[in-house]
Amino acid sequence: MTITQMQYFSMVCQFQSISKAAEQLFVSQPALSASLLDLEKEIGFRLFERRSRGVVTTEEGRLLLQHVDSVLKRYNLLMRSLPELAEHQNILHVGFRPTSGENEFFSLFKKYRQVQP
């Protein structure tokens, strides 16, 4: 199961409609339906009962949705934190008093640059 499939599944559960979910996800209805069918084959049970006016989540689908929503929340948190992590990449913060630490700083900085070019 991919993150994309989880997002698709969650959105269809939210709207109880493959067409409305497809519209919100900016994918075609046939592509979304195919992805859901692939997911059902992979996990071995039906997620939805198809009806003339949309879909109804099965009992198994409701149980799976709890786990999927938990994973998606963590995934979204991770994605939001990536820019912050990238900003701190390879940054060394150093503080010293100019009158007493200058010589020590340059000696340590030289050693640091040998280890971390």
Predicted ranges, named:
Residues 2-8, 29, 61, 68:
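The N-cap/first-turn positions of alpha helices
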Residues 24-25, 36, 43, 64:
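Core residues of bacterial helix-turn-helix
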